[in-house]
């Protein structure tokens, strides 16, 4: 579960986070 409060929290899960929504990180597809 990729939890976040804002998109900055997503950098620990994603190289290029797309958004934080409903407490979950969404990542851009990796190259």
UniProtKB/Swiss-Prot annotation:
Tell me the compartments it is located in. Answer: Secreted
GO MF, one example:
toxin activity
Residues with Pyrrolidone carboxylic acid modification: 1
Describe PTMs of this protein: The N-terminus is blocked.
Q: Kindly state one GO CC term assigned in the UniProt record.
A: extracellular region
UniProt keywords, alphabetically: Amidation, Disulfide bond, Ion channel impairing toxin, Potassium channel impairing toxin, Pyrrolidone carboxylic acid, Secreted, Toxin, Voltage-gated potassium channel impairing toxin
Q: Does the keyword Disulfide bond apply?
A: yes
Q: Tissue-wise, where is it found? A: Expressed by the venom gland.
Q: What does this protein do?
A: Blocker of potassium channels (Kv).
Q: What is known of its domains?
A: Has the structural arrangement of an alpha-helix connected to a beta-sheet by disulfide bonds (CSalpha/beta).
Name of the protein described by the UniProt record: Toxin BmKK12
What species was this sequence derived from?
Answer: Olivierus martensii (Manchurian scorpion)
């Amino acid at each position: 579960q990729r939890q976040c409060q804002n998109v900055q929290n997503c950098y620990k899960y994603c190289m290029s986070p797309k958004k934080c929504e409903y407490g979950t990180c969404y990542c851009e597809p990796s190259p």
